Amino acid sequence: MNQILIKISLAFIALIECSGFSLVFAQGNRPVGTWKDHFPYEKVLEVTSGGEFVYARTDLAVFSLNPASHKVNKYSKVQGLSQSNPTAIKWYDGDMENDVEGFLIIGYANGNLDLFQDGGTYNLPDIVTSNIIGDKGIRSIFVEGNFAFLACGFGVVVIDLERFEVQDTWYINGQQQLLEITSVVLHDDIWVVATASGVYEAPTDHPFLSSADAWTRWEDLPESASSYVSDLIYFGNDILVHLGDETSGRLWRSLDGSPWELFPGWPAEGTELHSLATNLTTSVVPENEVLLIGLCCSVERYDTEYNLIPEINALGGWLQVRDLEYDKNDPGVIWIATLIGGLVRFVTDPIEGGTNNGVFFPGGPDNANVRKLDCWNSNLWVATGGVDETWVGLYTSVGVHGLVDGNWIDVVSLEGENDISGIRDFLCVSIDPLNPSHIMFGSWEEGLIEVLDGEMVAIYNSANSTVVEGDFGSTPRTGVAGVDYDKFGNLWFTNAYSTSPLQVRLADGTFIAMDLGDSFTSNDNIGGVKVTRDGYVWVILPRGGGILVYDPAGTPGITSDDDWRFLSTSESQGALPSNYIYSIEEDLDGEIWIGTGSGPAIFYRTESLFNDDNETTASQILIQQDGNYQYLLETETVTAVVIDGGNRKWVGTSGSGVYVLSEDGMTIENHFSSENSPIPANSILDIAINHGNGEVFVATARGIISYLGEATNWDPEMESIFVFPNPVDEFHQGPITVDGLDFESIVHITDAAGRVVGVVESMGGRAVWDGLMSDGTPAPYGVYLIFAVDRDGNTSASTKLAITR
């Protein structure tokens, strides 16, 4: 096919990610209790323009661009959207005669619908709450006048955009044979719908468009009248249809009613097509109509005679086009949704000093893949691979990335080393406590991967270490599923399906394999690892194998004095509630919390773990609920446990989101789920905490999101306590925090006359005051004094707070 690549001179515009809120806080700060998404915004699937903005849809959220200022705003559940799975967007211009402002229409995979303006979101749940059985997902949105036509998995839903209500539902093939609709087109006085089984039309003046009797199928469609139609467009009086899915179909055309023919140059075996567009959607009537065809990795432009328009600059094929639209206000600008370049602005006829080409997207990770997290203050690193329930690798090779000092970075490969993007299934990650820029990853295929200052510096396998290949069946692989640094900088890790399943890389770089005798064979799997402060190494044995606890006796370089034991549901082996183990964590009191398939279990004392009397057993917390006694979260599979600065337990589950437990575990202080919070999915894979600022990172099956928590690390000296926000103005409605405190400090807030208006206790180094007087009213205008004293009464500190509201 004769292709002309629209190329762009890519002068990348470095854009800081922006919030959709108009907050008055200093840059980099945000109130306690607020959320922030860490979604990939570079992979844009759809674009629509209108008003002063251009909107782009990703797999998890939406973002807007102001073309004049280049300001980018993110819109996810954090900013008030209903869900985290948008599938279609379209701009509605509004109706000035009836004083209706324009807004963005957002459709979701389950049929939910948001009508979104900067001022808020109006949710229309009629489809998702309907009794329709089957796929309710919204495929695309067509707007005509004051109505939106939603192409859904069962038919077309007509929305009155002035009344915010469903006006009609078109069942193209009847309510007994629901038909998936891919797009809706209006041509002259005829409605045309593309479906999963051909093309149907009906006159616009038909009184019963909800009836199948109103619709006629195009029986002359090429290939088959029941072909899957992924796209359809009118170009003048010509019709173009793409038969087959987006990845491999054929583009056909009918010239002014003539017989169908394969589009000139289109491969007979089919190829990718992701968008068909014309410039007739602009508010400015163009001099000549132009057709755009968005292929896999290029864009073609044709005039009305189907002549390729002469080459105009360059668009690199690496962008991977997914959607196209002419700017509604400027027909000289084409907006291109791409998987790698974000939202691309292409100027068809650039002039000096005018609008430039550009690439736009908010900051974020390259992808939403995540299995494990590790965080050390302002350093968060993500292992992006995975295995299925039988521990077969997912063959995910998307590299690794980290959030360092607030910026997402990708690990790069040094010259002469293997390309890190080709390494599959990173399962685990650990940050060196002696050097937070030094990170070690475990791969299910390649062994240990060492990263320093954002660069991959080494791969450790049988060629240069004690790490060996394991018997994974037909293909030998070097599988490392667990890594954890101890406080001395020694890296403990597991080596699956080998005779050396537990190993350590000492801080000096020496590798040592632990001698476990005949406890393991090359047929045994071995998973995650956690080193506790007493030096014990706790190892997860996957798929119902329980736990291995290893005691290196304080000498990891000497194996002759070591000991180990296995824990299981057996009374003589720790009495775990389940042999299915997913997470191990140590709290601030030295208690070991185990995430099992039957809720959390706790080892309150581990000093006698290796005594012969076998008295160390796991406990479960008995609570009373609805008048009945039961074990805490006993029906949940606990996939993650992490401890915050206040010794609270953040518990992730396989299907119920995140529970926040009190220090003793007896009280559920909070429960975050996709139903009551911005968490994108209830399947929690891992949790990590930045103890420096209290930010809790939650890894879900649909990406990472964070919550600014109420607890941080503490400072026994309390030399630099500070209040946020300060001053508190009329716009602030949330809590007021005091940071830099000692553990469990008592904080008194007094007015200028010395009257106590609030007393709070810190969680770790942070105290949170609701800003209310004793009668529940907001503290009034004035200067307040903050007095803090540690729990022993030995150290104190003070500061001031101004309230200006």
What are these regions (language model features)?
Residues 29-50, 76-95, 124-144, 168-187, ...:
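Short coil-to-beta transitions that initiate beta-strands within beta-rich domains
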Residues 120-121, 163-164, 203-210, 348-352, ...:
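Short loop/turn segments immediately following beta-strands, especially the blade-tip
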Residues 383-398, 446, 498-500, 545-547, ...:
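Short, conserved, GDST-rich strand-edge loop motifs in beta-rich repeat architectures
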